[in-house]
Amino acid sequence: RQMCIRDRGLLPSEVSTVYLPIRRKTTFLKVREFNQRCQDWKQKYQPKVFFGMDRISSASHVRLGNGSHRAYLSRMIEASLYSPIRKFLNPLHRSILRIEREMFENPYLEKAIANSYMVKGEIVRDYSIDPSKITVIHNGVEWKELAPEFENWVETKNKIAQSLRLDPHIYQFLFIGNGYSRKGLLPLLEGLSLLKERNYHLSVLGKEKNMTPFKMRVKALGLDSHVTFFGAQTNPLPFYKMADSLLVPSVYDPFANVTIEALAMGLFVVSSKYNGGKEVLTEETGKMIDNLFDPDSICHALQLALERPKTWISSELIRNSVKKFDFSLQLQKVIDVCLQ
C-alpha cells in the first residue's frame, strides 16, 4: 500500500495520505515536531519502507535532494556568505544538523539516494555511514516532454528575443537561480567584465530579496548594457530557446536542476565545481570553472562558451547527451532501490 506522510499539500487520489498537523509556529520547532511525529508514526505502524524526501531521522530509505546541510554550511562559510557564529547560534541549523546526523547514523537506514557523487563524498567524509548504503541517481529531466519546445527553437528565437527586447544576433548567456549570492552571481559578474569580446548579453532570472547590491555591481563594472534582470519567471522555456549557454556558478548546489534542463534544451553549460550537476557534463556539452573566486578562471570558461554558439547541430548533440536521464528512467531507478 502506498502511503504518504505530509504536513500540507495535495497528492493524487490513488495515494493514501496521512496528515501530521504541525502546531508549532517557529521554523526550527516545526522541523523538530515533524521529525518526531514521523518517528511516532513509524513506530506505531512499522512500514516495510519508510521513504523520506527530506531529512527525517527514522527513514529506512531517503532521497537527499537537498544534499548535506553540513557541507552546505561549510561552503557558505568558506565563501564568506555566512558567519561561523551564526551556524552555531541559529537553532534551525542546529536542529537540521542533529536530524541529519541521526538519519545517516541510524542503523536501520537501508539506503540513501544522493543526486550526485559530490554529495555522496560529502556524506561519507562527514558522517559515520557505510558508503555502500549510498546510491547515486542523478536528477532526471522531462526529456521527451521537452521535445516539441526544443524542436522549434530555431524558428521562434527571433520572435522571443524581440518580445524580450534582446538582440538575437549576439551571444546570449543565461543565469537562472533563486538567491543570487548562493548561486554565485557576483563572482560571475566579475568574470564577465573581463571578457574582451563585448558582443554578448546576460539574462538573469530568479528570486532575490535584495537586488540592489547586484544591480550596483553591474553598474560599477560597466555592464549596464550587457545584463538584464528579469526576476522570477514561471516559464523559463522561452529563455532556454533564446540562449546560447547557461551559467551555473553555484557556491553550493547538490544538483542544480537547471543544469540538466538546459542540456535537454540544447544549451552549452558552464558550471562551478560546487554544483553536483557538473557530473552530467562532457567536454562537448559543458565547461567547469576551475576556481569560482578567481575572475580570470571564470572569464576563461566564459570565453570557451563564446566560441560555441548554439547551432541546430550542436544543440541536438547536447540534447541527446542527456536522453538517458529522462525523468521516467531516473524515477524507476529510485523505485528499484527501495524495492531491493
Question: Which sequence ranges carry the predicted segments?
Answer:
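Short, small-residue-biased leader/transition segments that mark boundaries at the very start
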Residues: 1-5
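Carbohydrate-associated surface elements
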Residues: 118, 140
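A conserved mid-protein helix/loop that constitutes part of the nucleotide-sugar donor-binding site
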Residues: 171-194, 209-212
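Aromatic "clamp/platform" in nucleotide-sugar-dependent glycosyltransferases that forms part
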Residues: 232, 251
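Short glycine/serine-rich donor-binding loops of glycosyltransferases
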Residues: 256-259, 277
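Short hydrophobic beta-strand element within catalytic cores of glycosyltransferases
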Residues: 268-271
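A charged, aromatic-enriched C-terminal amphipathic alpha-helix characteristic of glycosyltransferases
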Residues: 310-339
